[in-house]
Design a protein with these regions (language model features):
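A structural signal for short beta-strand/turn segments enriched in small hydrophobics and glycine
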Residues: 432-434, 438, 480-492
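Acidic, glycine-rich catalytic/binding loops that coordinate metals and/or anionic ligands
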Residues: 286-341, 473-487, 498-569
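Zn2+-dependent peptidoglycan hydrolase active-site motif and core
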Residues: 397, 404-406, 420-422, 426-476, ...
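Surface-exposed amphipathic alpha-helical segments
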Residues: 238-283
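N-terminal secretory signal peptides that target proteins for export/translocation
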Residues: 1-16
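Short, solvent-exposed recognition patches
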Residues: 37-231
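Short glycine/threonine/proline-enriched tight-turn/helix- or strand-capping micro-motif at secondary-structure
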Residues: 337-431
Length: 569
């Protein structure tokens, strides 16, 4: 059965969701699924107004310009609106820009970039050499670091070099590194329970160009979200919402750059495609054969007393993507690093203060007995434990008080030691692999590597932390590299600002695209499902650990974003 809608975008999306829910309700009532049933994500699909995009391209090129003669703006109404032949100017545009932005015609949404399309074509018409740098047309932003277009939409990253601000009419800044600006336009948006959705302040200077534009600062980025041609777009810059610093970009310095970027956006390509329907949540596939060994605590069941200011965890039973497990082999152990053996208790303090290998202590916020020994057996044992909303200095909208860990920590199979008396694990023994086919997002020296996945049913990012940056640089884990699922990206290490700065583990997190931009979601159940597929066996949920929390008020955690590491480079 096919259902067609011609209502405006938001109303149509809501109608499709209601109808999908009505069809699924009888199934839910007849089944005996528990509240913890693993399910796939629900994803909304935009309806693109390509005729409006073609009209804007015509206005940007200018009807009397030297470049106008190379485009046929007459709509071909004998073709359906989703047929690229219905808009020859868009096809011609793709043919001209494909050499500049590889794969641009794969995007099912209009590609907006800070590129002077009219100036570029006028120069070609007047015989200006094609050898002129593409950066000449990019409004001061250097050649783009990344451009990725696919069935879900597109993402791009540009950078503004230090010292270019004055030349571009921007205020001076304290930050001394290049400012990286990201833009995503997506056909797909994930339907997550986002308490901050729709908030933000309008930007008067850009209201005529983008009437619904909103500016927000959340989850470590200043974000500008807007809708154009029925499509959600988000421009974002990673920044710190505090005073300017030489090594940390302040959001107040990032905002003028983002607004300069948005003012420069022009249509550069993209291709109409057949409309798609709402992707309703479904039960996730899991192996039927039970595992004799693999057990896990429930989603959201963080160690007692380890949440920010005593907050609980965030239960989320969504398998956001059927991924390959990020470590090369099994066994592996998902659990806490800060609040298990050798952990630093998130700076809350250890009591008594341990003085040597094997010394007993506990975190002030918990009665759980620990030892100063990273090699302790509990660290390398089932069951797994969620630590997505464990106390950290990172803004995470999915966590109860807005702060959490952003991802899940995973230890490898074992803890090699340099010698018998060592209380630390030797890093760089266990492989880390790509969880899906995709493209990498990472600048040299950065501590994080992100894998971007763009398919007809997914627009999702996976971030890897604590591998050694020098080794990643040497291995070519850099912007634009395409990798295959299972391809090695590096080795599990302990890098956090410097080698040995944390325990030997992989921090793994998931971001999905929403109308607010890329947001962190709990990866725990996604990892359980991927591990089960690696094993070919189904894990068993066990009760949360009964650990008492010391009497008294919850920990008075004070967020110090300037000290945060995992959410930064």
């Amino acid at each position: 059965m096919r259902v067609s809608f011609t209502a405006p975008g938001h109303l149509r999306d809501q109608a499709v969701k209601l109808i999908a829910g009505a069809f699924l309700l009888p199934v839910a009532l007849l089944g005996s699924a528990s509240a913890s049933e693993f399910r796939t994500a629900a994803v909304s699909v935009a309806r693109v107004d390509w005729r409006a995009a073609a009209e804007q391209l015509k206005a940007e090129i200018g009807p009397d310009s030297a470049a106008a003669s190379r485009f046929n703006f007459a709509p071909q109404r004998r073709f359906r609106s989703h047929d690229p032949r219905s808009l020859p100017a868009i096809v011609q545009l793709n043919g001209a820009t494909a050499a500049l932005f590889t794969g641009i015609s794969r995007s099912p949404v209009p590609v907006l970039l800070p590129f002077d399309t009219a100036g570029y074509f006028a120069d070609r018409a007047h015989g200006v050499p094609s050898s002129l740098s593409i950066g000449h047309y990019q409004s001061g932003f250097r050649t783009l670091d990344l451009f990725d277009a696919g069935p879900a939409g597109y993402s791009a990253q540009f950078a503004l070099e230090p010292g270019k601000d004055a030349a571009e009419g921007l205020p001076p800044r304290t930050f001394t590194k290049p400012v990286e600006v990201q833009i995503t336009g997506s056909l797909l948006t994930y339907d997550i329970n986002d308490p901050e959705a729709g908030k933000g302040e309008p930007v008067k200077a850009l209201a005529a160009q983008y009437p619904d534009l909103r500016r927000t600062v959340r989850e470590g980025f200043v974000r500008y979200a807007f809708t154009k041609f029925g499509v959600p777009y988000v421009v974002s810059i990673q920044c710190l919402d505090s005073k300017p610093r030489a090594k940390r970009l302040a959001c107040r310095e990032a905002s003028p750059i983002a607004e300069r970027f948005i003012k420069s956006l022009r249509i550069v390509g993209g291709k109409p495609s057949r409309p798609r329907g709402y992707l309703a949540s479904q039960p996730a596939e899991r192996p039927a054969t039970p595992s004799p060994d693999f057990t896990y605590r429930p989603s959201g069941a963080i160690l007692p007393g380890t949440g920010y200011r005593g907050q609980p965890g965030h239960a989320d039973f969504t398998v956001y993507s059927q991924i390959r497990f990020p470590l090369q082999g099994a066994p592996a152990y998902a659990n806490s690093q800060s609040f298990l053996n050798w952990g630093d208790c998130f700076h809350r303090g250890r009591v008594p203060r341990p003085t040597g290998k094997g010394a007993s202590y506990r975190c002030k916020s918990s009665d759980k007995k620990l030892v100063l020994d990273e090699t302790a057996g509990e660290n390398y044992a089932y069951p797994w434990q969620d630590n997505f909303c464990e106390a950290r200095d990172f803004n995470v909208g999915q966590c109860a008080q807005g702060y959490g860990h952003q991802g899940q920590d995973i230890r490898p199979a074992s803890c090699p030691q340099r010698h018998g008396n060592a209380d630390r694990c030797e890093p760089n023994h266990f492989g880390v692999v790509a969880v899906r086919d995709g493209v990498l997002l990472r600048s040299p020296k950065q501590q994080a590597a992100t894998l971007l996945v763009n398919t007809s049913a997914e627009h999702i990012r996976f971030r890897y932390m604590h591998m050694n940056p020098s080794m990643m640089d040497a291995d070519g884990v850099l912007h634009g590299r395409r990798v295959n699922e299972g391809e090695r990206l590096g080795l599990v290490s302990n890098y956090q600002d410097y080698p040995g700065g944390t325990t030997t583990h992989l921090h793994f997190d998931v971001q999905v695209f929403t109308r607010e931009g890329w947001l962190w979601v709990n990866p725990y159940v996604t990892l359980i499902a991927s591990y089960e597929h690696l094993l070919g066996q189904r894990g068993r949920e066990v009760a949360a650990e009964p650990v008492e929390t010391p009497a008294g008020p919850p920990p008075d955690d004070v967020a110090k974003p300037e000290e945060a590491v995992e959410g930064s480079e």
